[in-house]
């Protein structure tokens, strides 16, 4: 009877080996599910934005095309907080296609960011629950197998424990993986480079296509090409250097750099005339009382002035290129030319004022030369070329020019105020005054700031705002991403006002602040050359 009773009891007690086999298979299945889910999260990289024109994306498009962007990298929110406009996950090592466009919809661009983040957070939560269930299976199996009701012998229990350990080996890495995922989800987020890349490349494909056949207006340009918001029409966007060279002669029509190119090109030609013909005919050249070093100082200044003029011509000729990296380097050539001209001007004044005190002359000239070299290297910094760095450029050039004041003060100490003022006066009224007037035009955007044919933007977004501020592409979209310039309010009441002389429409092609700046720089260079000859004559011929 006992045998039959035991036999009937074993029918209801599951076999230890069969139970562990089923437990192992279930754990393996759960692990494969979690592993597959984890891989889908890890491989979700964001390589580029949606290549659509800048228009509204409705919800159907978002859902229908969600499968196209499986390479998106997760934008990890901090727990379940909303991803704000300044919080993104950096997508390192990726860049936008320069010709891609992206549409953000009418609601808010942050909605797109939050939707991706929510999708990933849900995936992570699902994976976490799978791991939790697997861990629960392990603990329940261990508890049931060690229950006294099983009444298994020690050998069986030992074998079952070995199987339990093997199941734990499957569960353990899953728990560690999800802990790592949770840490990644909760880590602080940095501004994404993709927002910056998108905004910087916005309109590039359209501008590249239009630039092959026509000149563009301000709002057809990508953001890095927008420097003077008061100049609206006549922008070049060429894809070859040969087109840029031919634009010197307006081969493809008059553009907004024509007057800037020719103002300094004519100035360069006149400087060559001064160096070849005028200076060799001067009294300073022929008089034996003037030291030979003085003649070389004059030639050094004229060479620096020629370098400045040609660098400016080079920049204004090629700044219409469609290649951003080349354009930035071309701008640095122009800044370097200005730095070299200012440095050479200071060296000429220090030479003539401190010639009787050699140690002071060499000291001042060495310091000025070192600052000039430092300035040339600083000019090649990407930050120096940004539109928001315009005040910095002005302050640096003025600071460099003030080095000449130190030699003037030292001359007063060595002689007297009357002699120093008499010797230095030609530089003041023949050169410095023209530079100062030019700086006023350069920094104030006069006269184009008073144009009334179109509505001008109040500001240009800074480089940091272009990288982090989503309001530029949401709330301010109608300002910075408009298709055509907005007519001024005066044009609505008087349609003919847009083409009248009073509206200042012509500043796009001639008479803008930069052209005036060029004109006064040429006057300052010629004036400084005349001032040097006067100072040399007072110092060595008339004294």
From Swiss-Prot:
Annotated Gene Ontology MF terms? signaling receptor activity
Grouped into one coarse class, the protein's main location is endoplasmic reticulum
Protein species of origin: Saccharomyces cerevisiae (strain ATCC 204508 / S288c) (Baker's yeast)
The UniProt transmembrane annotation reads 260-280, 296-316, 331-353, 358-378, 396-416, 426-446, 506-526
Q: Name one GO biological process term.
A: intracellular zinc ion homeostasis
- The identity of this protein, by name, is ADIPOR-like receptor IZH3
* Similarity-based family: Belongs to the ADIPOR family.
Quote the subcellular location field of this record: Endoplasmic reticulum membrane
Cytoplasmic domain ranges by topology:
281-295, 354-357, 417-425, 527-543
Enumerate the UniProt keywords alphabetically.
Endoplasmic reticulum, Glycoprotein, Membrane, Transmembrane, Transmembrane helix
Mention any one GO cellular component term assigned to this protein in its UniProt record. Answer: endoplasmic reticulum
Its function, per the record, reads:
ADIPOR-like receptor involved in zinc metabolism either by altering membrane sterol content or by directly altering cellular zinc levels.
Q: How does it sit in the membrane?
A: Multi-pass membrane protein
* Glycan-carrying positions: 45, 123, 153, 256, 319
Per its UniProt record, what PANTHER family does this chain match? ADIPOR-LIKE RECEPTOR IZH3-RELATED, ADIPOR/PROGESTIN RECEPTOR-RELATED
Q: Which residues lie on this side of the membrane: Lumenal?
A: 1-259, 317-330, 379-395, 447-505
**Which InterPro entries does the protein's record reference?**
AdipoR/HlyIII-related
What gene does the UniProt entry assign to this protein?
IZH3
